[in-house]
């Protein structure tokens, strides 16, 4: 590498405070041409078997025309997949628009990230400190593989890690869903070796003068810098996600205008849709784009008259790509399976199609189980139990049909069978395998409806992202007209369901109904929206599923299946552009607010702490403290820690409870005894953790009062140690934020 040095002053721009982050025609007969082509001649629906909404693929026994050349065959395949009717040219123009959307989103999030952190001018240490909490923990494993003598040696190191939960040796690849870091590290090593081989410079390094009496730092730009490479790949992936959203909206609505609506709604509500521009290394940044692909494939499978093996295989692969990077993915897929089962129960999916979907989910779950080295949480999840119960109920369909009950009663029986069967099977499998890692999820949900409280639950609910959805959120949706448009589309779907169901629910003999309703993909999306709404209302962080799905649902405002009666009177383009113009009033203001966020990352107290640890402690010195700080200590100081921010493991939760007893009202000798069992040498005490609280009852001493009522009313231990750490501890380092206490062994 060529090292260039020059003095370069930063623009220390002030950073403003960030805002909290007549009767309609029959549906099957509606014309399915692009809503933007009202003036062109339309072809009436073909007789014979009717396909699902918006699909104009070849009928059974009819082959698509075979174009010449590979490019032509690819174009034809995409032409049929997108459900567009205008030929190869329209397919390529659709892909061109999708590519433009991807480029636009990549540029947008890259610009926001750079504006917020001034990332390109930070030193290596500052970049690592900018990855706070979980982000720093995940990035540390990428760094381990990148800096290892070889790729395989690096993978072995993270599979036999004793720095993360000292003195335990754990397989972090199994525990923390680290396949993204493994893949990115391999790409980085390949990229740098190839560039070195052909003599192309991959990074340029500068000497940056920081001013204010601070020492100069070296700052490197380019993909040859590990942090820059890591972030760049994440932003490229999430840029491609916007292309998927455009194709998704186009396919669901049957109109490219629907794709435009989806993309613009996403941009106008960007702060509610994603946080990748502020927190790139989080698991959702790697995982969510594959959920978008997976839902697009589910939509295609539901709409297609005949099942295609390629679509099912693609669904299985996208499931794996969604689940591998993120432990929470199984809960999202649970809502999808529940929605699909409900669509089946009311008659919009046939048994064979749902069985195939269930099989693909089962296969992908087993593949993830194997790739995660037998992570038993996957097999004992509600998702796995739900798959087994639905599979069993599909096999029992003949028995259900022989029941002499009304259609509505059969729905209730099947719904209750799924619900209680899933809960019971999950409970049984968890007991058999002795798994309690996801017990905190049940406790968290219980606390939302009842007055249940415990230490772990309060750590979650006292964080804003795990609280209920903010009351201002629906208002923000309304200002951009996203909520009103979605309500209109949902009302149209509900009207369609009501028309389909009339006369069916009253039937007393369930086996007499042979009709299979059409447009199951519309009903599925409405139910999935309902599930995401429930998640988003209960846990604010999960609105990151709700808002993008609302953007997809908004595309249905262009659907002739739902609004053909309106588009017969008014040009659809006029309606859609009027709506977009109204949306853009608040939407452009939201974008401007994001663009106005200008700042520069700096955390001098933590920088002092890390430098002191590097040069004043032994490499095997063991640290304990607040979870976010421990991630930075492990990443930048490379010291063993006993706790970390990945809170989904029962053993880690028990460790963290011991470490956080420093903020309780317990006696110092009792706390010291427990820390010594964990072989802790140094404890990093932060006074702010002792006094701050996000809301009443949420300071650390108040949380401990719930867990340890016997000591309630006593002075918190942290307050005592801030004044005088002796005789059980001794202060070895202190600045304005951190106080490092050595645990005395005598």
Swiss-Prot record:
Residues 59-68 have a biased composition (Low complexity). It is an enzyme of class 2 (transferase). Keywords: Endoplasmic reticulum, Glycosyltransferase, Membrane, Phosphoprotein, Transferase, Transmembrane, Transmembrane helix. The chain crosses the membrane at residues 137-159, 227-247, 257-279, 307-325, 331-350, 357-374, 380-396, 405-425, 481-501, 520-540, 562-582. Residues 1-68 are annotated as: Disordered. It is a multi-pass membrane protein. Belongs to the dpy-19 family. C-mannosyltransferase that mediates the C-mannosylation tryptophan residues on target proteins. The reaction occurs on the luminal side of the endoplasmic reticulum and involves the transfer of a mannose unit from a dolichylphosphate mannose (Dol-P-Man) donor to an acceptor protein containing a WxxW consensus sequence. C-mannosylates the first two tryptophans in the WxxWxxWxxC sequence motif in thrombospondin (TSP) type-1 repeats of UNC5A. Regulates neurite extension during development. PANTHER family: C-MANNOSYLTRANSFERASE DPY19L1-RELATED, DPY-19-LIKE 1, LIKE (H. SAPIENS). This is Protein C-mannosyl-transferase DPY19L1.
